[in-house]
Amino acid sequence: MILYPAIDLKDGNAVRLLRGEMSDATVFNTDPAAQARAFQDAGCDWLHLVDLNGAFAGEPVNGAAVEAILAATSVPTQLGGGIRDMATIEGWLTRGIARVILGTVAVEDPDLVRQAARAFPGQVAVGIDARKGRVATKGWAEETDVMVTDLARAFEDAGVAAIIYTDIDRDGAMGGPNVSATADLARATSIPVIASGGVSSLDDLHALKTTGVISGAISGRALYDGALDLSEALHALA
């Protein structure tokens, strides 16, 4: 199981939100590239980036910070937030992003996801963010009637590289991930599922890993707060 350290970008800073509320952001580092380098130096195999402003704006906003991170690191990086057309997808992949994460557009324009996955094999993931089993979009600001498993199954044969499943109510709350819901989703689809939201301890990582069906986990606040030591966590998962 791969551990993805998270860098959420807001106004050029590395921040964490509490339960997806932009008004409840804690700035952890004003130099995201330095933060990314620190994660790389600790031994991570991947980085997970989110352009929070971009998720709300519907287009990239923190591009300069993302490019600084790419210049400062060599590990593969996945990026989500405000990526809603082929030009943006191609632009980021050309600039060195290893995998783009499509969230809102997966609900609103699923054909674009299929088109992108065909054009860029292995480089397109779907981000499914949910409250109580229903998908939320536009930076979690809008809730839909779409069920998580239905959305995942819609891309079963599309060539999507991964599904990043975030339980919004767990995100940034340090209360542990929704292991059962994440495992249920992983069992419902053949697409690799990455857990996000609430991953805050070695016990959480162990619980996710022992399901045997979850391919990765994303952690942010716990790494910044020191509740989870990245080197120790990577060693535990090795």
UniProtKB/Swiss-Prot annotation:
Molecular function per GO: 1-(5-phosphoribosyl)-5-[(5-phosphoribosylamino)methylideneamino]imidazole-4-carboxamide isomerase activity
Similarity comment: Belongs to the HisA/HisF family.
Classification of source organism: Bacteria, Pseudomonadati, Pseudomonadota, Alphaproteobacteria, Rhodobacterales
Catalytic residue positions: 8 (proton acceptor), 129 (proton donor)
Xref: CDD domains: HisA
Disulphide bond pairs: none
An annotated GO BP: L-histidine biosynthetic process
EC number: 5.3.1.16
Name of the protein in question: 1-(5-phosphoribosyl)-5-[(5-phosphoribosylamino)methylideneamino] imidazole-4-carboxamide isomerase
Cellular localization per UniProt: Cytoplasm
Gene for this chain: hisA
Superkingdom of source: Bacteria
Keywords: Amino-acid biosynthesis, Cytoplasm, Histidine biosynthesis, Isomerase
Keyword field contains Methyltransferase: no
UniProt GO cellular component terms: cytoplasm
Pathway where it operates: Amino-acid biosynthesis; L-histidine biosynthesis; L-histidine from 5-phospho-alpha-D-ribose 1-diphosphate: step 4/9
UniProt enzyme class: isomerase
